């Protein structure tokens, strides 16, 4: 990523302002629902995260928030019946978070869906997504954060390792993965 000291091109600056404006429009749409923007983004993350990444700590890392802020956000989502805590069957000391059917219903009317439809209508889907992902990865790396990404794009992902419902494998976590798992975002993702 380019240094803050060197001026960006007018095109790059225009793109950054457009991304910022889109973010503001999404947050305004969130306010029109029963959720504040932090709650909406947390719900979106939990719906897109794999089973290993649906934890309060991973959510805090993804949002760039403190654990305390995320705790309050989760309490609000639980009170609204959109998220529930589940004991980790492998490690009783930790919990996993799950989006409830009501939460999934809420997401079916998510303002992000309208934005995705506009992007698709403009014919900019795949190229735009790739460019934005590269920009996001560079910005996150510059700030020392974790990128989060889909399992199937990770260097630890092993495709078609066994027959059955869980054909793929995560070499980092030594876990079998389903086809659906492969499309979800992971806190441990490392670009291939």
Where are these regions (language model features)?
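Hydrophobic/basic alpha-helical segments enriched in Actinobacteria
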Residues: 11, 15-18, 32-35, 50-55, ...
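Pre-recognition alpha-helix immediately N-terminal to the DNA-recognition helix
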Residues: 14, 21, 41-45, 105
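Terminal interaction helix/tail motif
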Residues: 15, 105-155
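N-terminal helix-turn-helix DNA-binding core of bacterial DNA-binding proteins
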Residues: 27-66
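Canonical helix-turn-helix DNA-binding module
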Residues: 52-94
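Charged, amphipathic alpha-helical coiled-coil/dimerization segments
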Residues: 76-126
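Mid-protein regulatory/catalytic core that forms ligand/cofactor-binding pockets
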Residues: 140-192
């Amino acid at each position: 990523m380019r240094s803050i000291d060197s001026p960006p091109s007018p095109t790059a600056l225009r793109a950054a302002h457009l991304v910022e404006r889109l973010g503001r429009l999404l947050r305004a749409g969130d306010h029109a629902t029963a959720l504040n923007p932090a709650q909406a983004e947390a719900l979106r993350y939990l719906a897109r995260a794999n089973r290993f990444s649906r934890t309060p700590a991973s959510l805090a890392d993804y949002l760039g928030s403190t654990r305390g802020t995320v705790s309050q956000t989760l309490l609000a989502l639980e009170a609204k019946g959109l998220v529930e805590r589940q004991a980790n069957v492998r490690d009783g000391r930790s919990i996993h978070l799950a989006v409830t059917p009501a939460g999934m219903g809420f997401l079916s009317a998510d303002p992000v869906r309208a934005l995705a439809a506009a992007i698709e209508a403009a014919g900019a889907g795949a190229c735009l997504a790739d460019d934005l992902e590269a920009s996001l990865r560079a910005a996150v790396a510059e700030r020392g954060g974790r990128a989060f990404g889909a399992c199937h794009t990770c260097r630890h992902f092993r495709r078609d390792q066994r027959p059955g419902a869980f054909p793929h494998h995560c070499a980092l976590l030594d876990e079998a993965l389903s086809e659906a798992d492969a499309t979800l975002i992971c806190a441990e993702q490392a670009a291939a």
